[in-house]
Amino acid sequence: MIGTSAKHGWEVGLSRFTIKILWLNENVAIAVDQVVGKATSPLTAYYFWPRHDAWEQLKTELESKSWITEAERVELLNQATEVINYWQEEGKGKPLAQAQARFPELVFTGSN
């Protein structure tokens, strides 16, 4: 594993990227921002699950950016997988604060 984290097993994007999560009752959406200095710049759109195949859309978008290394893509996609699995298996309908506590290294926003 590249960049391991004791809590979840992944340290996202080697500090070059931030994963943003839109936590909703009926969907979860995932986007990636690039860290530029002390700010961030949107790198992808928000991709929604289960409305669409967010993981596959994110994978395609990341692969289109040749300057992102394979290790970084794998790391970002593994984190997306963890979030989607959590939302599907136990997080759907749970409060935003609970999801934030589960994934403190990610940026969350939402309606609940």
Curated annotation (Swiss-Prot):
GO terms for molecular function: structural constituent of ribosome. GO terms for biological process: translation. It comes from the Bacteria. The keyword Ribosomal protein applies. PANTHER family: 30S RIBOSOMAL PROTEIN 3, CHLOROPLASTIC, OS04G0461100 PROTEIN. Probably a ribosomal protein or a ribosome-associated protein. This is Probable small ribosomal subunit protein cS23. It comes from Synechococcus elongatus (strain ATCC 33912 / PCC 7942 / FACHB-805) (Anacystis nidulans R2).
